[in-house]
């Protein structure tokens, strides 16, 4: 049952949307750079093309978040955004030159990044006081991611990269279908304090600006990972099937963490979880930059994805929920997505130029320093009670 007005929680419909949405990410994260490489683009151009959707993530969520909070029509925004994501991406079948692809990346991602922050707010509204169950819904996104990574990796190894755009379009249409099946959440009256404290007052509370800065640093540190890990592993002699399996391993670890995350939240503070996630991320990037040719080290580094994404994301979602309340949840989640987009775009850009100029080890080294800096900032700026 949902904690809101005794209404039943639409578990499978919410979970189904997460499954489809992150299935698309499972096609993008490991394989988009390989697709652009198959078209003959050099690393700097690949980094730019991968950065464009991340730049849209800096713009789109705040616009859609404001619109969602102002109108209350978050579910409509999700449905329209999902449909337009697919329709605009279909332009990729027309031309494959750099500037056309840049336009396609910008246009479809403007709508794609409208979707998730609003859906997170919808999910939290359905959960009500049972927000600790969020990870039990979100884990199905990880299942969708891992299935796509494995199955698409096998498909691309057999059929080649030419089938990649059609596979992506199919997943986008599935997202649109799943969004149509999700019911609107029950309406909750806003607390008096929510009306008294505006969005900006909540944003400038102690520790909140530092949190959002560190969100950007976390995603910046993931730049080499999401943009060049597959290329890095191919250069080290790993086959595409094994590369897909290694991506999937990280998500398996993430799923296992999601299964117990509601208990972890009851033991550790959000501050402790966030700081630990950054410290582990720093270690992970050092390992990937220096010892990825050792399969055992690579496997261990991928298992650490449970912390660098899983624990960090759940702790961050709860932090935003606590700081912004129901009234400003759409804008709070949108700002989280935006700062993640800023960091991700900067990470993709710097990794593209650094990879070409100084190589994998130093590129991952910069990522490790960014994560370490964020750990220090949060340990100093967040209270232990957080």
List each model region and its residues.
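Symmetry-related core transmembrane helices of the 12-TM Major Facilitator Superfamily/SLC fold
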Residues: 163-180, 362-380
């Amino acid at each position: 049952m949902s904690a809101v007005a005794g209404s039943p929680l639409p578990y499978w419909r919410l979970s189904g949307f997460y499954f489809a949405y992150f299935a698309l990410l499972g096609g993008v994260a490991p394989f988009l750079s390989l697709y652009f490489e198959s078209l003959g683009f050099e690393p700097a151009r690949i980094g730019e093309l991968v950065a464009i959707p991340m730049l849209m993530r800096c713009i789109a969520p705040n616009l859609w978040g404001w619109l969602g909070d102002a109108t209350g029509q978050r579910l409509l925004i999700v449905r329209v955004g999902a449909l337009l994501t697919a329709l605009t991406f279909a332009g990729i079948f027309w031309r494959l030159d750099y500037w056309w692809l840049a336009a396609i990346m910008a246009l479809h991602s403007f709508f794609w990044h409208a979707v998730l922050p609003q859906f997170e707010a919808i999910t939290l509204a359905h959960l009500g006081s049972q927000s600790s169950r969020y990870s039990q819904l979100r884990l199905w996104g990880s299942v969708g991611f891992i299935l796509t990574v494995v199955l698409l990796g096998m498909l691309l190894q057999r059929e080649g990269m030419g089938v990649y755009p059609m596979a992506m379009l199919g997943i986008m249409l599935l997202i649109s279908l799943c969004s149509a099946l999700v019911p609107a959440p029950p309406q909750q009256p806003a607390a008096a304090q929510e009306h008294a404290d505006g969005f900006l007052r909540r944003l400038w509370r102690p520790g909140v600006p530092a949190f959002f800065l560190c969100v950007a640093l976390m995603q910046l540190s993931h730049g080499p990972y999401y943009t060049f890990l597959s290329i890095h592993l191919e250069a080290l002699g790993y086959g595409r099937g094994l590369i897909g399996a290694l991506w999937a391993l990280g998500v398996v670890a993430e799923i296992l963490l999601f299964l117990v995350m509601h208990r972890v939240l009851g033991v550790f503070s959000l501050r402790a979880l966030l700081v630990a996630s950054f410290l582990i991320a720093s270690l992970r990037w050092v390992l990937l930059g220096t010892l990825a040719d050792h399969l055992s080290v690579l496997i261990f580094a991928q298992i650490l994805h449970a912390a660098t994404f899983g624990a960090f994301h759940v702790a961050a979602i709860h932090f935003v929920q606590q700081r912004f309340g129901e009234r400003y949840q759409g804008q709070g989640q949108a700002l989280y997505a935006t700062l993640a987009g800023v960091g991700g775009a900067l990470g993709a850009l710097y990794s593209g130029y650094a990879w070409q100029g100084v190589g994998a080890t130093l590129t991952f080294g910069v990522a490790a320093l960014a994560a370490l800096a964020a750990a220090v900032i949060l340990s100093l700026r967040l209270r232990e009670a957080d």
